Amino acid sequence: MANKKTNISVVLPVHELVGEDNVKLFNNAMTSVGNQEVKPDSVLIVVPEGSEVYKTLTEMDLTTYGVKTTILENPGGTDFSSQVNYGVSQCKTEWFSILEFDDEYSSKWFKNVVKYKDAHTDVDVFMPIIIDINQKDGGFMGLTNEAVWANSFSDEL
């Protein structure tokens, strides 16, 4: 499938990349973006301002992943939420997806997202979250995303 503009950015918050294992996880996450059948428009890597991780990332060749990638220094808090919020505030696309540095997308993730958002134009937010309910009393048990995440590897929407 030829790549087209998806109008989606990936926001990838990174607090630190210490040790070979974390660098490998980051590379796997970025490779999963680059290996998409339909690529997102850009990746925004958000790091704490003035951090060592900024230096580490600027020394890496981020062009090898095949997606426009920008490193943003978050001038405020260094927690996950503030990094996500800052990244979202810098998006130039209508849609965004949050990728943690130790997670990966299936190769058809964005292809399926584009199909889904095109088929459901009245929806403003897509969240791969399932609310687990106790069948006996209908009470809240928790939130999960594993079933939705695993379904992204399926050909079904």
For the regions a language model picked out, list residue spans one by one.
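Cell-envelope/extracellular polymer assembly enzymes that use nucleotide-activated donors
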Residues: 6-11, 42
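Conserved donor NDP-sugar-binding/catalytic core segment of glycosyltransferases
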Residues: 110-143
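Short, acidic, metal-binding catalytic loop of nucleotide-sugar glycosyltransferases
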Residues: 28-40
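Short aromatic/hydrophobic "clamp" motif used to bind/position activated sugar donors
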Residues: 96
